[in-house]
Amino acid sequence: MTTAPIDNIRNFSIVAHIDHGKSTLADRLIQITGGMSDREMAGKEQVLDSMDIERERGITIKAQTVRLKYRAHDGKDYIFNLMDTPGHVDFAYEVSRSLAACEGSLLVVDASQGVEAQTLANVYHALDAGHEIVPVLNKVDLPAAEPEKIKQQIEDVIGLDASDAVMISAKTGLGVPDVLEAIVTRLPPPKGDRDATLKALLVDSWYDVYLGVVVLVRVVDGVLKKGQRIRMMGTGAAYDVERVGYFTPKMVNVEELGPGEVGFITAAIKEVADTRVGDTITDDKKPVTDMLPGFKPAIPVVFCGLFPVDADDFETLRAAMGKLRLNDASFSFEMETSAALGFGFRCGFLGLLHLEIIQERLSREFDLDLIATAPSVIYKMKLTDGTEMEIHNPVDMPDVVKIAEIEEPWIEATILTPDEYLGSVLKLCQDRRGNQKELTYVGARAMVKYDLPLNEVVFDFYDRLKSVSKGYASFDYHLTDYKPADLVKMQILVNAEPVDALSMLVHRTRAEGRGRAMVEKMKELIPPHMFQIPIQAAIGGKVIARETVRALRKDVTAKCYGGDITRKRKLLEKQKEGKKKMRQFGKVDIPQEAFIAALKVDS
């Protein structure tokens, strides 16, 4: 098949909040245009969500792409390249790179729920990328749907004219053909010059067991052919193209891709790390001089230690992480050791959902039992000798005497919540040291903007927000800057030994509450030993909270009948000596669940 005329190509992505039905709409578009037969679609929902976890949680994690053929009402044949994007804030970089490869977006909004915080964030990404946007109202067949009200809401909140929004129900297929026509008439074709030197954008890459690294590309100028020698401008590496093709979602091989087309190439690339997302691909013999504007690389924001419960699983864990890293360049890890937990890894994630998903994939796909330490963020330390350092593990914090100032990262959070939960949401943000920036109303819902320290958000903010708003509030954030903070390092001591896995940086005002809650939890879960065990929370040398696990005690005087009190006293003294000795040399076993519970404590 020859490459299509550029005016008949439409590249678009679907932008929506979680659960507003974008993967289902993608299924319908594939079905109507014949990308997969009805037999292949049967029993399969969310064709583009290939990971089990994606289907189960109903979220899209990796951006996927599919090419569809469509004969429009004007009798011409069009080629659509649909880029499915994730909706969740942690995967914003997946969204930004899908959008960079398109000219237009379908904005899908649930007609019963309206605009959510992450819809907003993704729409702004699309507007920044210079997209034409077609609003689509989904689930209009539901009894709770209020299309007119939602249209008005789209205009008020986003500022888009939604009067001619397409009304659909992706589940039943109602109105979906109108979406295809809107794509043809309302979205622009790509621009590009077929005769110019090859210039293509590297949109994504992943590892395939048979083909090696598969690279998803969007050709901007020139032609990408099989057998051509290409160069990655960012890394300077050159490769020979082995195969060229596109997805329908099945892989189809072709001879070449022309300007405006989206497809994949494979070359003998060994690791995904060799391909930088957002890089420019060009011809090795006559390279272009200017690179395409890429997108910001994904920077890890949240860090935590992952340790195998069984020390023998360490190598399995290392191999498993290497495999996940093949497909997820934003996940980083390095080895670390902990006195309490043994060998493990310090990992960097884009956010809490990312952390949860990696953890779940490790335990599910590789059958590993893991302990995660408390999540932390990157702090900047200014030292008294004038140097600066960044730390993301509280254990590495230098001596307090050497620190002149600690700075922590802040975020701007946008929260949309129904009016009746506004009070609880505001209280939650205040408790987390937030500063309110603005509060506006969109119909019956409030939109609040808050500045919050990221440290307070990574722990369990999202869960708390969902629980105080009965699941109705939605939340999106972006990093703003670093600000000085009064942070202290809190350690948990068990039998006077610090447990490094539980040490954390907390704000001075919250240290006592946090410390007390943690020691109380630990007291419940550490089983009694033959000697009493003090559990303390301390800042520096000062203990701020303490609980004691009582000792198990044998009745040594049981076999003395009557007789002299000094005999009993001698036995009791002897027992006391033994206990004292035990306490000096005894080792306390801290069970697994005590760690996990202590880390989940909410102060």
Curated annotation (Swiss-Prot):
Domain tr-type G: start-end pairs: 7-191
Protein location = Cell inner membrane
Enzyme Commission number(s) from the entry: 3.6.5.n1
Topology relative to the lipid bilayer, per the entry, is:
Peripheral membrane protein
Q: Which GO terms describe its cellular component?
A: plasma membrane
Give any single GO term for biological process.
Answer: positive regulation of translation
One GO MF annotation is: guanosine tetraphosphate binding
Decide whether keyword Protein biosynthesis is in the record. yes
Which SUPFAM superfamilies does this chain map to? EF-G C-terminal domain-like (SSF54980), P-loop containing nucleoside triphosphate hydrolases (SSF52540)
Which residue spans adopt a coiled-coil conformation according to this UniProt entry?
none
Listed binding positions for GTP are: D19, H20, G21, K22, S23, T24, N138, K139, V140, D141
Alphabetized, the UniProt keywords read:
Cell inner membrane, Cell membrane, GTP-binding, Hydrolase, Membrane, Nucleotide-binding, Protein biosynthesis
Q: What class of enzyme is it?
A: hydrolase
| Reactions accelerated catalytically | GTP + H2O = GDP + phosphate + H(+)
* UniProt cross-references to PANTHER family, sorted A to Z: TRANSLATION FACTOR GUF1 HOMOLOG, CHLOROPLASTIC, TRANSLATION FACTOR GUF1-RELATED
Q: Which NCBIfam families match?
A: lepA, small_GTP
Q: Which family does it belong to?
A: Belongs to the TRAFAC class translation factor GTPase superfamily. Classic translation factor GTPase family. LepA subfamily.
**Which HAMAP family did the record assign?**
LepA (MF_00071)
Q: What does this protein do?
A: Required for accurate and efficient protein synthesis under certain stress conditions. May act as a fidelity factor of the translation reaction, by catalyzing a one-codon backward translocation of tRNAs on improperly translocated ribosomes. Back-translocation proceeds from a post-translocation (POST) complex to a pre-translocation (PRE) complex, thus giving elongation factor G a second chance to translocate the tRNAs correctly. Binds to ribosomes in a GTP-dependent manner.
Q: What is this protein called?
A: Elongation factor 4
Originating species:
Rhodopseudomonas palustris (strain TIE-1)
Q: Which gene encodes it?
A: lepA
